[in-house]
Structures are given as structure tokens and as C-alpha cells.
Amino acid sequence: MDSNTVSSFQADCFLWHVRKRFADQELGDAPFLDRPRAHQKSLRGRGSTLGLDIETATRAGKQIVERILEEESDEALKMTIASVPASRYLTDMTLEEMSRDWFMLMPKQKVAGSLCIRMDQAIMDKNIILKANFSVIFDRLETLILLRAFTEEGAIVGEISPLPSLPGHTDEDVKNAIGVLIGGLEWNDNTVRVSETLQRFAWRSCNEDWRPPLPPKQKRKMARTIESEV
């Protein structure tokens, strides 16, 4: 096993521990409080994949971080901060919407790269909006924390979340996953729209009602429908 992979996991475990302690004392704002919840599943998945115990890794990570801090001068810290591009955290969902449990009558799940797409196929003829919490850098989506599909009544009927065992995804991965989710929901005659924040940063192209361009398969389906009506 690569030593850098192990040390990276150990450092991540300790940094998660620090964030969790900070959050437990209610010292963080909403974006900060979201991160420990989202990263916990990822660490468990990585620990299982690497065969490493999280508690032991956290202790080792503490030693790594302490050693770095001992060697770090104030001037070097200022230079590091100045050279790192700042990312922004954007929220469509409240903490309650993020953490709420939901159930599917007719569950369907699909994995697309490092993202898991889930939807309830029993939902029909509903108006649905997609909301997401994510970070942005250089005016593009950097990391998706969680995306959920809501009916007008507030019920959750779909979700896109990063797989804990496969960290890392691009804005293109998210765009493709959203297309899959929209296609699945629209198959049952639901009307789906995307929040303006997500639309703006997940992809650049859009049509007049702030919807993503239809994938080729959906375009062919729509064309056949129009032809049959004519």
C-alpha cells in the first residue's frame, strides 16, 4: 500500500475529528456543520477499502499534523494561505432538508462514476425541484456534498450523493448524474426543474426555463412523441 495514501487518510481522520469537536460545541456556521456529516461516510468507506482502523488512523494523523505545525513559521503560513484559491460553499437546502430520512416505495439506484443516484419510481405527475449543497471554485462546481429532489409538498423523491468508497468527482460527473436523475423522474411524467444556483455552477448551457439540455436519448423520445401526435 502506498505510504502517501495511508498518511493522507490518517491526516483526514484527525482533521475530521477536529471539525467534529468544533461542531459538537456549536461553534460553526451551517456550511461548517455540513462537512463532518458528509465526510464521515467517506472516511468509513476509505477505511474499509484500505483496511485501516479509523481510531488508530486518527491518532497517527494527530502526530502528522502536530509535526507540520511545529515546523511551520508564521511567514510560511501567510504565503500558503495567499497561494490557495478560495472556494465558496453554496446551500440550496437547510440542515433539516440535508439530514432528513426518506423512503422509496419503488426504489431505483444507479452508480455513475463516484456518485450514487437514487430515485423513487412510484412518483408520478409531480412538480419537482432539484436542490444541492456544494462548493464552488473559479465559478464552477468543485465538490457536491448532497443533491436531493423535492416535490412541491416537500417530500424527498430522489438523491445524488458521493460514494464513500470512491472519493473525488468533477463538475461533468455531477452534470451527467443530474441528467440521469432528471431522465428517470421525467419518465413517469414528472416535471423537473433545477435550482438557479445549481444550474449556474453545474453547467453553463441552459435553455429559457433554466433546465439542462436534454440528453440524446430524451431528445429522441421527445421527437417520437411529437411525431405521433402530429
From Swiss-Prot:
Region of interest called PABPN1-binding, as start-end residue ranges on this chain: 223-230
Keywords of the record: Eukaryotic host gene expression shutoff by virus, Host cytoplasm, Host gene expression shutoff by virus, Host mRNA suppression by virus, Host nucleus, Host-virus interaction, Inhibition of host innate immune response by virus, Inhibition of host interferon signaling pathway by virus, Inhibition of host PKR by virus, Inhibition of host pre-mRNA processing by virus, Inhibition of host RIG-I by virus, Inhibition of host RLR pathway by virus, Interferon antiviral system evasion, RNA-binding, Ubl conjugation, Viral immunoevasion
Mod. after translation: Upon interferon induction, ISGylated via host HERC5; this results in the impairment of NS1 interaction with RNA targets due to its inability to form homodimers and to interact with host EIF2AK2/PKR.
Motif span (Nuclear localization signal)? 34-38
The source's domain of life comes to: Viruses
Q: Would you tell me the Gene Ontology cellular component terms?
A: host cell cytoplasm; host cell nucleus
Keyword set includes RNA-binding: yes
A Gene Ontology BP annotation from the UniProt entry: symbiont-mediated suppression of host mRNA processing
Q: Where in the cell is it found?
A: Host nucleus; Host cytoplasm
Q: For the region CPSF4-binding, give the residue spans.
A: 180-215
Question: Which molecular function GO terms apply here?
Answer: protein serine/threonine kinase inhibitor activity; RNA binding
Give start-end ranges for motif Nuclear export signal.
137-146
UniProt cross-references to Pfam families, sorted A to Z: Flu_NS1
* InterPro entries for the chain: NS1, NS1A, NS1A_effect_dom-like_sf, uS15_NS1_RNA-bd_sf
Q: Where is this region: RNA-binding and homodimerization?
A: 1-73
Subunit structure, as described in the record: Homodimer. Interacts with host TRIM25 (via coiled coil); this interaction specifically inhibits TRIM25 multimerization and TRIM25-mediated RIGI CARD ubiquitination. Interacts with human EIF2AK2/PKR, CPSF4, IVNS1ABP and PABPN1.
Comment block on domains: The dsRNA-binding region is required for suppression of RNA silencing.
Q: Which family does it belong to?
A: Belongs to the influenza A viruses NS1 family.
Name the job this protein performs.
Inhibits post-transcriptional processing of cellular pre-mRNA, by binding and inhibiting two cellular proteins that are required for the 3'-end processing of cellular pre-mRNAs: the 30 kDa cleavage and polyadenylation specificity factor/CPSF4 and the poly(A)-binding protein 2/PABPN1. In turn, unprocessed 3' end pre-mRNAs accumulate in the host nucleus and are no longer exported to the cytoplasm. Cellular protein synthesis is thereby shut off very early after virus infection.
| Protein name in the entry | Non-structural protein 1
